[in-house]
Swiss-Prot record:
Residue ranges of the region described as Disordered: 310-354, 390-474, 514-550
Subcellular location: Cytoplasm, Cytoskeleton, Microtubule organizing center, Centrosome; Cytoplasm, Cytoskeleton, Spindle pole
Organism: Rattus norvegicus (Rat)
Cytoplasm listed as a keyword: yes
Recorded coiled-coil stretches: 578-627, 695-789
Protein name: Centrosomal protein of 95 kDa
PANTHER family on file: CENTROSOMAL PROTEIN OF 95 KDA (PTHR22545:SF0)
Gene symbol of the encoding locus: Cep95
Amino acid sequence: MASSEAEWVTIANNLLFKCHIHLRIHKLQDCDANVFIALYQSILGEKVPDLIVIPRSQEDNAHNVQAVIDSLALDYLQVSLSHITGENIVKGDKGSIKNLLEIFDGLLEYLTEHISESSHNRSASEQFCRDSRGEEPVEELESAKESSWRKVPFMRCSFSPDALGPTWDEEEAESTGEIIRLGDTAHTFSLRSNGAQNSMNFWSRKASTSGIRPPEEMLNPGLSSFLFKNGPTCEEEEAPPIHMATSARKLGEPIRAAIPLHPPYHPPEPRAPCPIGKEYLCSGHYLSTPASGEHRAPSVEPGDVFLTSTLCKDDDQETDLDLTESSKTRRLSKGERSENRAVAPSEYPPFPQKARKRLTEQELHAMSEKLSQRLSELDWMLKTALGDRATGEAHGKDGGAGDEEAHSANEEMLSQHSDSVMEYGPRKPRPGFSMHRKAPYRSHSLSPSSVNKHRQSEKERKKQHKSKGTDTHHFQAKALTEAFERELRKNKVQENVGLRGIREEEEETEKSYKEAFAKGTTKQSQVQKIYSRKTAAPTPKGGLLKSSKASPMKVNEHSLLSLMLEQFPFLYVSDPTLTKMWKQQMAQVEQLRREAQRENRSKKKLQDEIEEALRRHDLLTALVKKEYDHNKRLQDFKDRIHKQRLTQSKIKENRHQSVRARKYYDDYRVQLRAKMMKMRTREEMIFKKLFEEGLQIQKQRLRDLRNYAKEKRSEEKRQHQNELDSMENYYKDQFSLLAEAISQGRQELKARQRSQAQTLHKVKRELRAKMEKEIEQLQHLITQSDDDAFFRELEAERFKARLQLASFQYSKNPFPRGQTP
């Protein structure tokens, strides 16, 4: 799918355009609740359950989107969509919007293909009903059925008015992954349309040079019917315009009836047909390139095998002519069938329910007939391939043994004259299988006579009116698989036998070489013996010498002589002998190489034939598996319809039961109420009188209890008062004792305070005396400082300090004796 936001916007706009919704978005966040509700109602044709028509808030929009998601998950897809929520959609979460757009895109794609298939199947069943009443020959009916059945998986058309029923979801995929894989339309339409133009040009060129019809005849009903009636070639008649081929329109055609238009109805404008339908058929499913020297019969379905036969023998040429005629008849009937399919959706009204059931059974019968015919054709092609291989083996092994020639001749006879692949080996008959084994064509037989053709046509007519179940298809698939396995085992055994013979011849040659060398060796001389003893490798103690026979030797085709010289280094061989032996070895190598090349050529041819048989077996297995899956899907569809009907009947029965139970309950309730209203009996009066007496007794009892409680309360009150008085006396005594103790404490405290005051006064007096003494000393010092003697003493001390400094600085200078500094 698309990765960028612009591509997702394009996908959303394409969805809105296809569903005729007049909305366009410019960014991914524009996909709100209204867009998804409109897509739901347009694609599915139903209203959203539990829808709030006029949303007044963001919660209402989230509720509407969640209703759309829940309806898709529960009613249609039947898978969990818990990763997508309505709240995220309303908030503009890009991941949730992309997931929901992808689901709607895949759902629209799947519905388109489903409705196209149902319309084609309905037209095929209509044609079958008309043909069974004798309106057309039987051979034309068979080819027309085959062509319509083969084109169903590839053709698409617009919706028909009765195509979308209430039970469409019973044939849908089982998971979101399958629904998503059905989509990818917006991204792949451009790729399909680009590759389609080239294929149309190719077919137009091929129609002018060969007799093969282009696929426009299969898509063009008018031209096909004209060719069937008058028989001109493709070059004589010109194709009508493309718009006549209504079945070729795919998703480009607007969806009309399945999508209700809630606004006022506007008739859709005629739109140019989308080139996807026809060109996609031409490019993907009808194109076959012819090889030089070969003739290929074109087929419609890619699962069919192209019939190829070389123009080298007379009987092969006759077979090619028969194949060409049959392919032309088949193509003409296919063209007529496409006309009937294109007209069917507009001619016939919707069928009632019983008619639809009958048509489903007729479709199953027609499909079983077509499957048996295709299996017989593939059986004939396998016989042709195996017969050619047996003939090639018989011509390629001229120099082989006689038993091989007899085996190849016997195999060729079996491949030419047997009726099926199952006659190559012993087998047990299977029930219900032998009547379908003969093929309508033979490749290696002589030209068929008119009697054989008449018998063959009678058998085909009988087979057309006989119903076959799915068990027959299982038996046929198993039988063909066993035949292929038996043939492959036979080829592998033959290949292994040939390889074993080559190995035995090589071993015998090596043995002869060894014997010749053993006989031709001379005795060793004394010198050689001494040399060999000296050059012999010393063995470890306790060990043994290894013999040359202990390990197997590997000898290549070029290394025999060199290996012998390495094994016998002490042996003397002359140069001429060595040269001669080398030449013999080279000649032997050349001879072995030529034989190996011849063997490789035959082996390669056999391998190519085996690969071709395997390829055809794979194609056949894929075809049978496809038919089995298709029948299984049809059976599952019928089972789902049956289960849905059973479920609906059970729901209806449960509703009836609930209604009956409700009605019975209402009747019982009314009767019981009437009965209770009428009950005025003696028992009721006795009960009432007893109740009144009980009330009087209860009242008297309550009075007695009240008096007794009053007496008790007065007695308790007296006791309580006495207790209070005693407690009051006790606490008075305690308080008096406490007052005495407090008074004694006060007196002691006062005495202590008086003693403390006296001590404090004494300390104050001592401090005052001390301070007065110190002040007097200070005053005396101050008076001394005012004297001159004090200052002189200070100056003498200062001068003395200076003299000490001067004696320290000038102590080195010489002074005359008798002088002091």
